[in-house]
Each structure stands twice: as structure tokens, then as C-alpha cells.
Amino acid sequence: GKPTTMTSEQLETLLRNTPVNRVEKAEVMYSAPPELHVRGAVINVVIKRSHDYSFQGELSTNYQNRYFSSGGANGNFRFSTPKITLDVMYGADNIKTMEYTDLLSRHTLNNNVYEIMQNEKLSSKSWMHNVRTALEYNFNEKNHLNVAYTGSFTPDGHNRSIADGSFQQSNLDKFTDNKMNNITVQYSSGIGLEVGGDYTRYTSDNSQTMFTQLSDKSKNSYTLTGGQRIDRYSIYADQKHNLTNNWGIGYGISYRYAKDYDFQTYDNVSGNIKPENTEAGLNEQTTGFYFSLNKNWATGTSFSISATGEYYTIGNYHKWAVYPQASLTYLKGPQHIFQLSLSTDKSYPGYWDMQSSVTYLNGYSELQGTPGLRPMTNYNLNGTYILKQKYIFGLFYTHTSDYFAQTPYQATDRLALIYKNTNWNYMRMIGANVILPLSMGNWYDARLTLVGMQARQKCDCFFDVPFDRKKWLFIGTLDNSFKVGKNLSFELIGNIQTPFIQGTLDLASSFNLTAGMKWNFAKDRCSLTARCSDISNSSMPDMKVRFKEQYLDMDSGAYTRTVSLNFTYRFGGYKKQKVKGVDISRFGH
């Protein structure tokens, strides 16, 4: 298959809606081979190609209510011949959100303690337009060319923050205009060679206006104009060889270049704030190469091992790294399967997060950039035992070096709450998980998932409050499915999580109860889905800081209950395909 950015829920929907005769193979990989250009655990689904003439499509509409009502519509169409497959997709969504945050800060400054109480209302509204066109040309059974264009546009975004409290009252309005265009080309040959590349252009423009009145009647205000321009290129080449006795080798190279330009200009500044304008660029290059070896036995036992070398540079930061991947599956028999895997992963901070910038969120809170913020590297070791092909017992160990996260900090030189991404020494987790399926006849299926682990988080350079903390975490999830006839089903999902930590933050326990139904009708051409998630409005944990002289309470769970409806109509036997998504996680201000 191809890389995707689909969530696990979307992937589950895809698998349930795809008939068995359309699937060529489905593989669960706890340690993905490097030629997939993703790291960690993946599900690789390969769909059979069409060999006839057809026109298929899907029309859908959705509604969601979480304080505000949102909704959208989407259309997917596919035209297929033995040589050509053309996919066209367009979707439009009207998005409205609302969040409330209650804050209590006992801020120590010059040996005095200031109690600051604040309520902040955050709202946003926008129209998002997504378009995708993909053309696949089959030269023959084994040689294929794919060209795809993906666009995403949010032209009139409006975010508003209204804060009211004992220290300050403020009003901030932010208007945004974001555009993303991507084109991808991929060629697969019958000799095991695959080459490809893509280009992404992202532009973002925003303007802000903030007005603040402090408790001493002094006033601060500013207007701001900012933006981001990103050009990103990537190319790769992979080669696979199938050898005798079910041995296989693979090797490949890849190169990615990204050029980022950010600017932020303040104007009409008044009061006791001293903002600085930002105008900076980043040039990032990543060069990788890998070699892999795999073997399959007739008994079902298999193993694979690979190593990926990477040279990464951004600004004055240069680093060589090697990322090992290994997996072993041993079948003692169909009733007993043992799996062992080692995987590595790397996550990068957003480009704007790496700039030297300060953005004032209200009269008390500010967001600071972190020049020199490094990518985090994650190492995972997993051992799994599968009993009777359904009961799963696992052990895992995870070590993440240079882990970064955004944690609030009460400044020691002024009354300001700072949000800033910081690299930690590491985050380490060790634990176990159990998955137990349950069923009664053909009408009831359930899956109980239990996870227990201990986390250790260490950072020697978090402002003037270094930390080294440990915490046990337990998670339990029960997923129930009830079938009423062939076309109607209900689900009830409960999830509970014990208290946890994030840096200096303490996170309270949380609970999420979700109920839903799905009805297929009109000979499976139509489906109606209804769902209510977080029925008890308790999925967002309360947060607090009680660390050295830092004292902070935050509650952002005022309204998290979500009701959603989705209607889908398909014609021509259309089944939604898994497609490559464009990663824009590092874009935006």
C-alpha cells in the first residue's frame, strides 16, 4: 500500500466496508519495513485493481454538535478502465468550535504570592475545502504510474479569545487564510523498482488585534500581521528482490528538502508590552538510505530486519542517525503465535515552534518559540503472544530521547504565564497490555483492552525547575457491538484512565462513554450513522501544577460532549480506498 494519515477509526471503517473479494492482502506489521516510508506499527491493506469498465461514486453529508453546530458534505467519484483509473474528490466543511478554560494561578513573584483567577472563552469558525484528483495508468499488470493532486483551503478563519478575571480583561481576534497544494508522482515497475516524489506548497496569512485592561486600570493593545511560506520537496527510490527459498532483500534512498519563511510584525503597540518583530527562514534537509532482509517459512514463521541511515540538517544543527527495525513472528501452531519487534520513529516540531518569537494570547498568557528545538527519536520494543488467534497479551518498552512538549510555566521576573515547547532528556515507558474478545451468538461482540504502564519523564533544562518524575498509568476500554438483524447495529464504548503526568503538570483521571448506531438500507447503497461521544462530559482531565513554587489549576472540560450524524449514499459498488494523505502537522502559526 501507500502511506496514509487516516486515524485508526477511519481505517477500521475502511476495513469493515471493503468486501473480502476486493482485498488482495492485509498485513499487520508491528515494525514496518523501510520501503513503506513510515516507522512503527502499521496495517498494510492492498486492494485488487479493477480490470473492467465502471463508474462508481459516493455522496455523504455530516452534522456535528459540540456547543456549536458544524457540518459538511463530501463527494467521491471513480472512473475505471483496464488501463486507467481516475479518482475525483471534493469536500466542504463548515467548522465552529467553542472551549472554556478556568484558570487559577498562585504566582510567586519577588517573595509575594499573587492569586490570579481567569475564565477564557475560545471560539473559532471557518470553512474548509478539500479537493483531490488521482490518475493511475497501468502499462501492464506489473507497471503502474500514479499522479495525484491534493488541495486544502481555509480562506476565512476567525478565532476569538475573551478572557475575564481578577488580573486582566482581554479580547483577541485572529483572522487566518491558509492554502495547501500538493502533487505526488509514483511509478511501480515489474522488477521491484519503485520511484516517486512530491511537492507541497503551503501559505498562511493571519492578522490579530488584542486589547487588554489590567486590574490597575493600565491598558495594553497591539495589531499584528503574520504569515508563513513553505516549499517542501521529496524524492525516493526503492528496490526489492525476491530470492530463492522465500528470502528477500530491499534497499533504497530518499531525500527531502523544506524551505520555511516566517514573519510576524507588530503595529499600533501601546502599554507595558515590548513585542519584537520576527522575520526568519529555515532550510531543512533529510537524506536517508536503507537496507532490509526478510525470510518467510512455509510454517508461517517469518522475520525481517533493516537499518536506515539518516543525515539531518537544519540551520547549524547536523546529525547522523541510524534507525534499526526488526520483527520476528513464530508460529508454534495455529493456536499459539509469538511476535517480537523493534521499531524506531522520529517526530519533528513545527517550523513556527523553532522560531524566536513571542505571541501574546491575552494580558497574562504568552506563547514563546524555541530556537534550536530538536526532533524527538522514539525506540519501541514489543513482545506479543496471541492465543487461539484472538486473545492478545503484550509487553512493551518505549524510550523517547529529546522528547518535546508544551508545558505552562509561571515566569519569575513578571506576572506572565509562558507556554513553550522544550526538549526533555527523555520520556520512558514500560508496561503490559491485554486484549480479550467476547461474543454471544451472532448478536453480540465485545473487546476488552487493559493497559498498565509506568512512565518516567526527565528534563534538566525546563526553565529553573528541572524535573525527574515517575507515574503509573492504567487504561481500560470496553467496546461493545450489538447486531439487530443484518442491517442495524449499535455500539457502546467505555474508556477510563487513571491520573497521569506531563512534565510538571498533573492530569486527573478521565472517563469517556460513547454510544452509536449504524443502519444500512437500500441494498447497502445507503447508510446512516449516529453517535454521541463523551456522554458524561468527563473525557478532558483537570490539570494542575504543584511543583516547587509553581502553582496552577486549569479546567478545559466545560463542554466536550459531541453528537454527530452521517449519511452516505454509494452507487456503482463504490468502496472508499485508502489513499496517501499530505502531512501538514508541522505547518501553521
What are the residue ranges of the model-derived segments?
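Short acidic/polar hinge/loop motifs at secondary-structure boundaries
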Residues: 4-31
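N-terminal periplasmic accessory domains that precede
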Residues: 11-13, 27-28, 38-60, 73
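Outer-membrane beta-barrel translocator domains and adjoining extracellular loop/strand segments
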Residues: 40, 99-112, 152, 157-173, ...
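Transmembrane beta-strands of outer-membrane beta-barrel pores
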Residues: 61-67, 81, 92-96, 151-155, ...
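Face-selective signature of the C-terminal outer-membrane beta-barrel domain
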Residues: 84, 128-154, 173-324, 331-335, ...
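Outer-membrane beta-barrel signature, preferentially recognizing the C-terminal barrel domain
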Residues: 282, 346-395, 399-401, 417-431, ...
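Gram-negative outer-membrane beta-barrel transporters
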Residues: 423-497
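C-terminal beta-signal and adjacent terminal beta-strands/loops
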Residues: 521-589
